[in-house]
Design a protein with these regions (language model features):
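Active-site histidine-anchored catalytic micro-motif
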Residues: 1-139
Length: 139
């Protein structure tokens, strides 16, 4: 059994969903491990990770709009406002989604469905560089 750690950086342009599947698959293909488990963890509290459909961009649009409605940018609603009107809503959205994803790896392939992709869900308005820790365990 082996373990490999790796970190990728994703540059966001503000709120939205950013597909990082290709970066992860590219890294995975270079590893000696053929079968195992891959855990991906985002090292931030105002962005998150989701597995979502990659075929119809309307899915991503609707997902973002849904979360904007349940966690609106209105400082009157929140006590934590020192980092801007988007900060507390970003924390709420991150709490309602995932900060880590675990996937099986079989024959060097991520076990994703046909229409599934890995997304970083940026909840802040401004651009950020987000770090994603990859921990691969297997043989």
């Amino acid at each position: 059994m082996e373990q490999i750690f790796h970190e990728i950086k994703i540059n966001t342009k503000g709120q939205g969903l950013y597909d990082f599947t290709n970066e992860t698959v590219s890294w995975l293909n270079k590893q000696k491990i053929n079968n195992g488990i891959l855990n991906i963890n985002i090292l931030h509290t105002s962005a998150s990770l989701v597995i979502q459909e990659n075929a119809d961009p309307d899915v991503l649009y609707d997902l973002k709009n849904f979360f904007d409605k349940i966690a609106p940018m209105d400082n009157k609603l929140y006590k934590h406002t020192t980092e801007g009107k988007d900060d507390m809503p970003a924390h709420i959205k991150a709490a309602l989604t995932n900060n880590q994803i675990t996937l099986s790896v079989k024959n060097k392939k991520l076990m994703l469905g046909t229409w599934q992709a890995l997304y970083l869900f940026e909840h802040r308005i401004e651009k950020h560089t987000r770090a994603l820790s990859h921990h691969l365990i297997g043989k």
